[in-house]
From Swiss-Prot:
It comes from Escherichia coli. The lineage of its organism: Bacteria, Pseudomonadati, Pseudomonadota, Gammaproteobacteria, Enterobacterales. Its main location: cytoplasm. The keyword DNA repair does not apply. NCBIfam families: PRK09919.1. It comes from the Bacteria. This is Anti-adapter protein IraM.
Amino acid sequence: MNWIVIDTVIQPACDISFSAIWCNIKLILWYQSDIFLPPGCIFTPTRTGVILNNKELPVTIYNVTPFNKNVWNLIKSSQECPANTGNITDKCFNHRCILEICPYGRK
C-alpha cells in the first residue's frame, strides 16, 4: 500500500520526525530516520523501513495515529527545526539534527 506525504516536521533535539500522510485515511506518522520524507513523496512501508524511489531505506516507526488537526498544529508549533523559522540565512545553528543533508538547504 502506498502512502503519500502531506507535510513533515523535524524535531532535531529528539531525532524524531512527524509526517502527515494519506493512505485511504489521513494519519500522523512518528518516526526516526536519517532520511527526509518531503511533502508529495510516495512511499511503501515495510517491516524494516520504507521503499522510496525503488530503494528500501531504514526507518524506525514509533507510532501511527489517526490525523487530528489539533495535535498536528501542536506538533507544527513546537517544531525545533530552524529552517522554518523565517530567518534568512543559509546556516543551521542546530548541531543536533539527525539528517546529514538538510532538506531545506541549510549548512
